[in-house]
């Protein structure tokens, strides 16, 4: 009876020789591995505005230079992870880079940070999706935590059925979200260029605003940098790509970075033009869609796809966590159970463990996204920083052709990500202090 139920839910077992058929194309990989990063535009620009609004609406123009700074950081991270993919074609990302160049303990810190971050990816994304859902259907509010837990179980079961099936199902909502936002930005830009959209800026660029300090701007920048969570996922899953894996992974990474940069700049720029400010009962993205598209079918399409991608962003964690756990298990830092493939050739044990831990987090934090995001964003900048400086050491030791330019790029990127991490730590210490306790325990446990 149990086996029959298992086959109904998960599907028939696959032979190991079918593993090569589990490799995914660039088209599917962009959806399955980029949903986390791309979905962050739904809250990243809003986080910048929320921070600046402390000193008043006139400070909104600072979102423009801050968005440019985030774009520069995105370019640095994309370049860094492009180099990491070619240097470490078997995957592992920041874990392999740190372990190989900085030493075992730093590698374990990077690996532990990423594992924790992937758990938080699932918890944050699912909680955000549940928030959006209950906002649309208020009668479900009292069941928000239960809804979030059920959504985790749905994504968990989808991944237990196998990677290719998961990628096929999840690719459609992600591309609908991308197309919806790109069309919205193009229409909005056209209206601005042709004078159809009256400017409602809160203040002109360059306006001196009392209360704005370097500390506030850095805090706003770090909040905006939450839009970059998930950028590293592709480097951890190179072996999931069809051959040639590294080349396909790099092309997917560049496509993701380009789309993310376009969406971020478009949303920030149009939000400034329309004078949009954060409101308690709605989101910045929702306000922008309403201004540009009107409250019609197109508006609800953007809202619906936003909800879907926030939920499906959790799938990035379900893809990257098992790959990283398998790499660390092969290095004897985690139980061998994490290297075992299930009936459908996925790392079933990792998938189940990740789902259970994410559900526990959602219950502990009562599904409150605002309390999870600081931990989430802070944790991801640890492996970002270690990966960058690990590559710096690699270039110094190897001194291969073009090493100086690569070294400078990684050194600048590493410095920026370290500064962002410290800003998070200092400005939001009361929310992120568990990172300082939990990560050392994880490393010692390895």
Regions found by a protein language model. Name each.
Residues 1-55, 79, 90, 98-105, ...:
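Membrane-interface "cap" regions at the ends of multi-pass membrane proteins
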Residues 3, 49-99, 104-111, 124-151, ...:
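Extracellular loop-to-transmembrane helix junctions
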Residues 30, 337-349, 384-429:
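C-terminal membrane-solvent junction of multi-pass transporters and transport-like membrane proteins
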Residues 103, 255-313, 338-363:
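TM-loop-TM module centered on a large, flexible mid-protein loop between adjacent transmembrane helices
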Residues 104, 144-149, 240-263, 327-363, ...:
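Loop-to-transmembrane helix boundary motifs in multi-pass membrane proteins
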Residues 155-190, 254-255, 373-386, 405-416, ...:
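Membrane-interface loop-to-helix entry segments
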Residues 175, 179-229, 427, 431:
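Helix-loop-helix junctions that connect adjacent transmembrane segments
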Residues 176-203, 267-275, 385-400:
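Hydrophobic alpha-helical segments and their helix-loop junctions in multi-pass secondary transporters
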